[in-house]
């Protein structure tokens, strides 16, 4: 470029100036004359000549990659990024780009010489006369200049393009134009950045230059200082590359940068604006650049000149009829009597086409002729429908639909032409049949709703391209466009499947901006059957073979002339030897001869490229989102599928059938330097990617979650291999270029924790699946006939785990923390440096509370050095531990967590197993190599154990299970404040053997006997053996509650024989009153159920007296709560239904009836908790004498279904049935004080029978039993009631209140307790209480009544705290 001017050296300026090729002699003479002009006049004189600015001289102490990334918005320089640090090559901070958010340079053309300022216009300098086209973004679309629009007097032009640019957003243009000193105002313009592609140099602090590349090789960018001059021209000195006033990244324009932009950040408008284009510089060794400020008036006028008169549709006058004469390039839009002339392409002149703007609500246009509008576009300010007569088409620069508009487009295009669409509004494609034209959209919404022709053919477009990140294309149905012809260009856009099922055989996505989504309520089915490959192969370049050897690209084609014949070779290695002697051309490891026919050689290379592509992995850089399921069948040729974009399918399933699937992060793209790849496997900077779906379904697949990827999904695996935290990674060596994907496979291990992959969800493994966890994991695992291997130090099982026929191994620094219980029918293995932590479940929104959890396994194998097993914070673990290597076992914690009350049955069960300790283990520890520590913990020996060392603090070690005795062998024992519980059958016992050293104090030695010792029996059984010299005070006899007794062993210490032994002599046993009281309270629950029924026995007969003896069907519901000593409380709901009949006799009314009852009660105390459900029935009779006397009789049977859990003596949960009988009689006399007021003395006697019950179980190895026999309560009651009746014309209410004394005449049942120390009998007691009641009965209708009563008792051992009785009666 820059062909209009040549460069000449001017000694006055110390640099080059641009002169016309037609004026060389004049300029030479002028330069000579400049030597006589004062230095102060130099700037003005230099500006008289159009010096060519020729481009990028930058600091040598900053990595050149920084300047490249800056220019292309890559690396750190993402648009909008703030406070970007700039470091030199030694890692020292040079400065920060903190005065403005990072600018978006996408509006700068790919060659850096022009900038897009409107969808169809660019700006540059007019002396750039050589370029005829521009491209943007990744340069895949080329736009032709149809009019250069050169400024008449200054070095500036604003060319018009043939099409609307869809890839990028135009740059905003300064609103201040050439206003004097405007850009020196730093309060408004806070930063100045430039980008260009001129000749590249680096400069050191001594001013030495090193050339990097020639002009237009690539773009660089950087900072410039505040302008020294600001008017129609901006002048500054970015060539002073180490001067801080130019910012941390100064970039001095040099040869090739003419027309490149200068951007300024407008703080007032909060956006970057282009203010000028680069015109000149002061020479390679100079410092000054000159920019021409954008002449905004001229620019606006240029764009305005390309518009025809606006068209205003008037509703009610019919459609706009559009006729067009291709020969003249003119047409007419007419509506009624009004006409608008338009201009289209004239011959080959695209610029003859003018833009049309349409307004008017709900407009309609009909094309009568095909319209070729050239570079003219259509802009719709309002919603329109555009249709065409049969076969008529439209072509032009494109369509703009303004925000809020919906344009229905019923016009087909032309093959080979693309409809370019911009604007935030909607364009609905609604033509008929097959549209051979394509679509390129860069903004707004395009709805594809093409209609079928008479043959049923539909095609909205032959191809669709989305770019710039702004557009959305919505599929009306699955036939609108061949999915394989949909592509996403620079920054992409959204393809909305709109509830349709769509199949892709290839994905053409340039970058992360490519989005496939579904926003419809109907779920879409997306099939990625990625078997197709790109068959477009560029013509390979042919390199020359150096006779002296050299380097090249393996697989590329080279040629050499030998004996006057051109021979073609394919290079096999990265370098090759000389071809003169030791001819390397004959070495098959270096070269492959492919003949002397150029065309055949070229085709051979192409065929091999295609063959290679058939095996290449598929990399999708884009995004899958919305309401859809995605299926990926096996890809032919074993090709792998890699996602380095993202997936967000919260309610969707992604399924992979066979083959390899990889989710990974994305390497940060950097600008290429001299052909370098934009990304590499060994780079340090990667972008995180998120993958979210409801379910990831894998069948016969190999799945990898690699670096910088986060997966949030459940996984269902069938015969598949899952690697979480894989080091496997792929990069696309064409990433960010928009070219065909060139994958490179390798390994990439993250350097920081934040770059590691992470998984959250629940995994189900089936049918020989394998799971390798090498990264952060949170969730659950269920494995069936599968294998799990953990090497990650950060694996958290938050859901209950199940392993059936499956292995679980933690090794190589892996750490598994389980928080919610686990089941395994096999052994869990910890290898070298592997750690397993079993914990309770953290309680949400608390700092240190944990709910207990149970871990049931067949065992734990500690097979590698430094393996560790930790049982802590409310965990109960069972399963033998075998330590075959030096390892550690920790039970409990010296800083124990607070155990929360159980909210689930599983948690309650786990809590009961802890027995008040912070953690518990049940099993043996073998191997002799484990170091075991216990803090506030319980270890129940499940078998003989051998360990290296044992440290015990405030803990308990006991032996339980079958009647086999256990031996604990430990080399070194350190125990303090702990409890050791051993068993004996009076002949043998559990034993503790310490072989090397025993230390500690305040330890209790307790003995649980399995047989009842004879009075005064001497035992002489060794319990603990320790090395000689061990303190005799280390163990003392402890007292332990076992069953219902407090048992204290009698011991003596024997120091003879070279050991210290603690020997059991016998026992002292006495009843434990607390345990006995709990047992008695449990057994007396039946008495309290009996009293509940007694208090509700005669309610119906009392109602008869209040209702003047009306008989009939009735129903009653009662609810109450009671309490007693020992923390006892109960509550019940009691329902009665019945029917009675009245018999009128001489002087007496006799009522007989039948009743059925149901009671649901629950009870809780310090000793037990549970529920009783009772069902019963009975007969009753009531005699009401005319004198006021009455007699009530009732008989009743009740069956009780009981379910209770005792928390004493290891009772556990018991389910049992009982029954009871009742026979009651009550008599009294109702004396009327007035006609409606009465007093009623009463006396009642209830006799009953309550069935007994017997329980037998074991507390440890001690046999226990509890029994109470059938007993017959006799309960009396005397009292008085006072009542009054209130009545009206159609109603009456009887209110009453009463008090009575209820008392037991017989003791309740005796409880018999038995354990190894003997039998204990607890005699039944009597109870009594004062009852209070208040109630009312109301007549609702003649034959309906409603009653309500409240009761309470006091002064008893068992009292009714409150009771409510509601009844309803229907008389007939």
From Swiss-Prot:
CDD domains: PL1_Passenger_AT. One of its GO terms (molecular function) is serine-type endopeptidase activity. Residues 1-55 form the signal peptide. InterPro entries: Autotransporte_beta, Autotransporte_beta_dom_sf, Autotransporter_pectin_lyase_C, Bact_Autotransporter_VF, OM_autotransptr_brl_dom, Pectin_lyase_fold/virulence, Peptidase_S6, Peptidase_S6_dom. Its EC number is 3.4.21.-. Cleaved to release the mature protein from the outer membrane. GO terms for biological process: proteolysis. Residues 56-301 form the Peptidase S6 domain. Residues 1106-1372 form the Autotransporter domain. SMART domains: Autotransporter (SM00869). Keywords: Cell outer membrane, Hydrolase, Membrane, Periplasm, Protease, Secreted, Serine protease, Signal, Transmembrane, Transmembrane beta strand, Virulence, Zymogen. GO terms for cellular component: cell outer membrane; cell surface; extracellular region; periplasmic space. It comes from the Bacteria. The active site is at residues 127, 155, 258. Changing residue 385 to P: In strain: M4243 and YSH6000T. The signal peptide, cleaved at the inner membrane, guides the autotransporter protein to the periplasmic space. Then, insertion of the C-terminal translocator domain in the outer membrane forms a hydrophilic pore for the translocation of the passenger domain to the bacterial cell surface, with subsequent cleavage. The S.flexneri genes encoding ShET1 enterotoxin subunits set1A and set1B are contained within the pic gene, on the complementary non-coding strand. NCBIfam families: autotrans_barl. Involved in intestinal colonization, displays in vitro mucinolytic activity, serum resistance, and hemagglutination. Important to penetrate the intestinal mucus layer. This is Serine protease pic autotransporter. It comes from Shigella flexneri.
């Amino acid at each position: 470029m820059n062909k209009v001017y040549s460069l000449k050296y001017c000694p006055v300026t110390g640099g080059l100036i641009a002169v016309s090729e037609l004026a060389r002699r004049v300029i030479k003479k002028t330069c000579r004359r400049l030597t006589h002009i004062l230095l102060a006049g130099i700037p003005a004189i230099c500006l008289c000549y159009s010096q060519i600015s020729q481009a990028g001289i930058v600091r040598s102490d900053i990595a050149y990659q920084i300047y490249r990334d800056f220019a292309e918005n890559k690396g750190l320089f993402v648009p909008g990024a703030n406070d970007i640090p700039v470091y030199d090559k030694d890692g020292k901070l040079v400065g920060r780009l903190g005065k403005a958010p990072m600018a978006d340079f996408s509006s700068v053309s790919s060659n850096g010489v022009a900038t897009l300022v409107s969808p169809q216009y660019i700006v540059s300098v007019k002396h750039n006369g050589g370029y005829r086209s521009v491209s943007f973004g990744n340069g895949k679309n080329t736009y032709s200049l149809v009019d250069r629009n050169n400024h008449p007097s200054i070095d500036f032009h604003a060319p018009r393009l043939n099409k609307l640019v869809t890839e990028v957003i135009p740059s905003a243009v300064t609103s201040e134009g050439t206003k004097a000193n405007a850009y020196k105002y730093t309060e408004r313009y806070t930063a100045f950045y430039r980008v260009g592609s001129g000749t590249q140099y680096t400069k050191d602090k001594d001013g030495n230059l090193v050339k990097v590349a020639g002009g237009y090789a690539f773009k660089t960018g950087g900072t410039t200082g505040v302008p020294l001059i600001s008017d129609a021209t901006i002048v500054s000195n970015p060539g002073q590359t180490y001067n801080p006033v130019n910012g941390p990244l100064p970039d001095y324009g040099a040869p090739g940068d003419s027309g490149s932009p200068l951007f300024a950040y407008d703080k007032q408008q909060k956006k970057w604006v282009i203010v000028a284009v680069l015109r000149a510089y002061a020479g390679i060794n100079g410092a000054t650049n000159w920019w021409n400020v954008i002449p905004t008036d001229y620019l606006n006028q240029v764009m305005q000149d390309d518009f025809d008169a606006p068209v205003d549709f008037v509703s009610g006058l019919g459609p706009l009829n559009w006729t067009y004469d291709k020969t003249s390039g003119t047409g007419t839009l007419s509506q009624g009597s009004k006409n608008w002339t338009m201009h289209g392409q004239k011959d080959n002149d695209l610029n003859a086409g003018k833009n049309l703007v349409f307004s008017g609500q709900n407009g309609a246009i009909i094309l009568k002729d095909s319209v070729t509008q050239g570079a003219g576009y259509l802009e719709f300010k309002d919603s329109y429908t555009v249709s065409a007569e049969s076969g008529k088409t439209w072509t032009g620069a494109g369509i703009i639909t303004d925000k809020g508009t919906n344009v229905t487009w019923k016009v087909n295009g032309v093959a080979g032409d693309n409809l370019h669409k911009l604007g935030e509004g909607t364009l609905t494609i609604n033509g008929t049949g097959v549209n051979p034209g394509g679509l390129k959209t860069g903004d707004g919404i395009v709805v594809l709703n093409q209609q079928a022709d008479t043959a049923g053919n539909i095609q909205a477009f032959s191809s669709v391209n989305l770019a710039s990140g702004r557009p959305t294309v919505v599929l009306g149905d699955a036939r609108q466009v061949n999915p394989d012809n949909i592509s996403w260009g620079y920054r992409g856009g959204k393809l909305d499947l709109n509830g349709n099922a769509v199949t892709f055989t290839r994905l053409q996505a340039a970058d992360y901006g490519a989005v496939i989504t579904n926003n419809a309520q109907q779920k879409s089915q997306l099939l990625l059957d990625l078997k197709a490959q790109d068959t477009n192969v560029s013509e390979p370049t042919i390199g020359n073979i150096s006779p002296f050897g050299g380097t090249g690209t393996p697989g590329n084609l080279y040629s050499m002339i030998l004996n006057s014949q051109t021979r073609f070779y394919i290079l096999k290695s990265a370098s090759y030897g000389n071809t003169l002697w030791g001819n390397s051309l004959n070495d098959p490891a270096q070269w492959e001869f492919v003949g002397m026919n150029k065309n055949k050689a070229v085709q051979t290379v192409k065929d091999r490229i295609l063959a290679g592509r058939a095996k290449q992995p598929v990399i999708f850089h884009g995004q899958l989102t919305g309401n859809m399921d995605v299926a990926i069948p096996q890809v032919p040729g074993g090709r792998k599928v890699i996602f380095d974009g993202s997936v967000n399918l919260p309610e969707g399933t992604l399924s992979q059938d066979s083959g390899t699937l990889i989710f990974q992060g994305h390497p940060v793209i950097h600008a290429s330097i001299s052909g370098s790849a934009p990304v590499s496997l060994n780079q340090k900077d990667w972008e995180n990617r998120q993958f979210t779906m409801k379910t990831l379904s894998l069948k016969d697949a190999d799945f990898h979650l690699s670096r910088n990827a986060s997966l949030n999904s459940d996984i269902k695996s069938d015969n598949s291999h899952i690697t979480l935290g894989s080091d496997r990674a792929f990069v696309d060596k064409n990433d960010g270029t928009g070219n065909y994907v060139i994958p490179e496979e390798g390994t990439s291990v993250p350097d920081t924790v934040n770059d590691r992959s992470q998984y959250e969800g629940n995994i189900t493994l089936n049918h020989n699946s394998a799971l390798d966890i090498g990264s952060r994991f949170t969730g659950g695992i269920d494995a069936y006939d599968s294998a799990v291997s953990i090497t990650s130090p950060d694996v958290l099982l938050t859901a209950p785990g199940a392993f059936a026929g499956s292995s679980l191994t933690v090794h190589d620094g892996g750490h598994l923390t389980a928080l919610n219980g686990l089941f395994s029918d096999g052994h869990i293995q910890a290898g070298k440096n592997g750690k397993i932590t079993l914990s309770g479940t953290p309680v949400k929104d608390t700092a240190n509370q944990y709910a207990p959890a149970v871990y049931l396994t067949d065992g734990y194998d500690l097979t590698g050095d430094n393996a560790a097993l930790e049982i802590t914070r409310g965990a109960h673990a069972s399963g033998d531990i075998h330590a075959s290597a030096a390892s550690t076992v920790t039970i409990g914690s010296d800083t124990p967590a607070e155990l929360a009350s159980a909210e689930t049955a599983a948690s309650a069960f786990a809590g009961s197993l802890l027995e008040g300790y912070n953690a518990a283990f049940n099993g043996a520890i073998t191997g002799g190599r484990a170091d075991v520590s216990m803090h506030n913990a319980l270890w129940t020996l499940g078998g003989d154990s051998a360990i290296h060392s044992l440290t015990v603090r405030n803990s308990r070690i006991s032996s339980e299970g079958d009647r086999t005795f256990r031996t604990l062998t430990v080399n070194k024992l350190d125990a303090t404040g702990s409890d050791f519980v051993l068993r004996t059958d009076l002949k043998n016992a559990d034993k503790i053997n310490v072989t090397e050293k025993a230390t500690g104090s305040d330890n209790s030695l307790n003995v649980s006997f399995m047989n009842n010792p004879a009075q005064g029996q001497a035992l002489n059984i060794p319990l603990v053996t320790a090395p000689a010299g061990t303190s005799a005070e280390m163990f003392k006899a402890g007292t332990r509650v076992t069953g219902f007794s407090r048992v204290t062993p009698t011991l003596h210490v024997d120091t003879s024989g070279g050991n210290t032994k603690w020997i059991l002599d016998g026992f002292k046993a006495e009843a434990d009153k607390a345990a006995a009281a709990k047992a008695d309270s449990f057994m007396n629950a039946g008495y309290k159920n009996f009293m509940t029924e007694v208090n509700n026995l005669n309610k119906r007969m009392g109602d008869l007296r209040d209702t003047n003896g009306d008989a009939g069907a009735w129903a009653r519901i009662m609810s109450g709560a009671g309490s007693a000593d020992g923390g006892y409380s109960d509550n019940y709901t009691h329902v009665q239904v019945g029917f009675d009949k009245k018999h009128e006799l001489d002087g007496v009314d006799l009522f007989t009836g039948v009743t059925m009852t149901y009671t649901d009660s629950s009870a809780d105390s310090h000793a037990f908790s549970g529920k009783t459900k009772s069902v019963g029935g009975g007969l009753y009779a009531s005699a009401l004498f005319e004198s006021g006397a009455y007699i009530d009789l009732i008989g009743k049977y009740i069956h009780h279904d009981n379910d209770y859990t005792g928390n004493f003596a290891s009772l556990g949960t018991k389910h049992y049935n009982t029954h009871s009988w009742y026979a009651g009689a009550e008599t009294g006399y109702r004396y009327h004080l007035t006609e409606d007021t009465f007093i009623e003395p009463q006396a009642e006697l209830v006799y009953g029978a309550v069935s007994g019950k017997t329980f037998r179980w074991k507390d440890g190895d001690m046999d226990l039993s509890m029994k109470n026999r059938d007993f017959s309560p006799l309960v009396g009651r005397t009292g008085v009631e006072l009542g009054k009746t209130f009545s009206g014309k159609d109603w009456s209410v009887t209110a009453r209140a009463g008090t009575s004394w209820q008392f037991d005449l017989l003791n309740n049942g005796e409880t018999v307790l038995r354990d190894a120390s003997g039998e204990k009998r607890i005699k039944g007691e009597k109870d009594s209480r004062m009852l209070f009641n208040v109630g009312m009965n109301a007549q609702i209708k003649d034959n309906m009544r409603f009653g309500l009563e409240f009761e309470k008792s006091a002064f008893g051992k068992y009292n009714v705290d409150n009771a409510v009785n509601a009844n309803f009666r229907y008389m007939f």
